[in-house]
Amino acid sequence: MNLRFLNSRKLINIIEMAAQLILQIYHRDNFMVEIKEDKSPLTEADKKANEYICNQLTSIYPDIPIISEENKNEDYEKRSKYEFAWLIDPLDGTKEFISRNGEFTVNIGLIHLGVPVAGFVNIPCTGITYWAIKGCGAWKKKYNEEDSIMIEPRGEDGIRRKKKIVLASRSHMNEETVEYISKLGGDVELKNVGSSIKLMWIADNKADIYPRLAPTMEWDTCASDAILRELGGGCHIYFKEIVIGGGGGGSGGVEYLIYNKECLLNPSFIASVD
């Protein structure tokens, strides 16, 4: 597999411009909110960012299909033939966007035969883009700054905290998640944050583990998963009968999330970096 066709600067520019479109609407006094068939909210920002990202990707990479939260996606008979595909969540954390707490992201992931091989995640309210292309390391870049800074894999010399920082969703803290956290052992500090920011905190070594034992869609995780995998971790499937003590992303029978399945719903997973 050759990923040299990917232009990281162009992709960073796309996600940064989408973030700016979102912020223009975010800073208005008010904006329209619709309710989709699945009861989730949809704003003008979701629509504008999605349209911009899809148009830009189609212009630069016309042969790569797009799977997006805000598009009518092809049925599986056609999708199953995709070699490469973009998975896009133009505004992850729409509820956070509406509540104006700043905890929302833009997500562009690329898969190859179901495996995430590139990911770009922007946090509009901080201006930071995290990104990775398989085999090229993981990076972060501040808006209006020219260069990206490499995120060092943790390895043997990585920062080790006395407390294990565990992340949880603001709106999906269920009994199974509470039970899982209680079995981790040691000194645990629980933090709540919205959207794929949780996964980027793990990538940036600001947290250790994120158990997601509630529904998510493939476009919610693909970009972040690609970044975590480049750091030696990832989103691995959670099996209740196995008590995982905060590891993951390594060997030993760990099964990672796969993408472009017939059903685009993710199983429960644990995100971490060894």
Which residue stretches match the model-derived regions?
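N-terminal subdomain of lithium-sensitive/metallo-dependent phosphomonoesterases centered on the IMPase/IPPase/PAP
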Residues: 1-91, 179-183, 243-252
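Oxyanion/phosphate-interacting regions
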Residues: 1-13, 19, 179-184, 199-274
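Residue-level signal for inorganic ion chemistry
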Residues: 18, 22, 46, 57, ...
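Conserved beta-strand termini and adjacent loop/short-helix elements that scaffold enzyme active sites
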Residues: 36, 69, 169, 193, ...
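Glycine-rich active-site/cofactor-binding loop and its immediate structural neighborhood
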Residues: 82-125
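Acidic beta-strand-loop-alpha-helix segment within the catalytic core
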Residues: 108-200, 246-274
